[in-house]
């Protein structure tokens, strides 16, 4: 048996070489494809290492290297995103208020390793609902229901101030906080509508009174003008009888002009035109 020789396979060395090259090439291709990762615009990455855990370095946008299997990137979106919350709270005068809040939130990029250690990737769902609801209840309780309407901007500023401080404790930044809607109970809403109707009625009554006063002043001024006109006409008649003759001539001319423009032909005597030329005193007073 010891003298038995195994025949050599033709081309065995070439196959072995090709096999080695294939294995090495496959490992190289695997390493090349799994040792690179991309960080898109508006994102940041941190690295989890199986030996040391989360590294403190934050990786910016671009392509980066990692050790396959030993390292794994965790990518965060650091752009501001809207978050909507609705909460029902009691005001200082015990009115139930449903308030809607919109916040623009983003993680602090330089604190991403700490955020991952304490909150994980879904940090917003773990932090924002609790601190927003707590802040809304605390702030709304300081105002009456009517003040929430008239001082809405001040309420929004106070909510923003408290929320910004609370969120910073969790390494979360708030770029904007705004109240989107305020909804009150049926009784309070009915009271507000009744108050608005009363205010409108009061304004309408005020307008009517002012209009009546204006009409009264206009009537007085008109009466004074007519009295003055009558006085002047009386003085003119007393001073010169020809004034009456002039008025008669003007009246007759207006009547004649109206008849001339009419489609029907009418013949009137001078007496019908209020114009009695024979009875008129056309002589001018010598004094004039």
Swiss-Prot record:
Residues 1-10 are mitochondrial matrix. Mostly expressed in proliferative tissues, including vasculature, shoot and root apical tissues. It is a single-pass type II membrane protein. The keyword Zinc-finger does not apply. Residues 186-219 form a coiled coil. It is found in: Mitochondrion inner membrane. Component of a prohibitin multimeric complex in mitochondrial membranes. PANTHER family: PROHIBITIN, PROHIBITIN-2. Belongs to the prohibitin family. This is Prohibitin-1, mitochondrial.
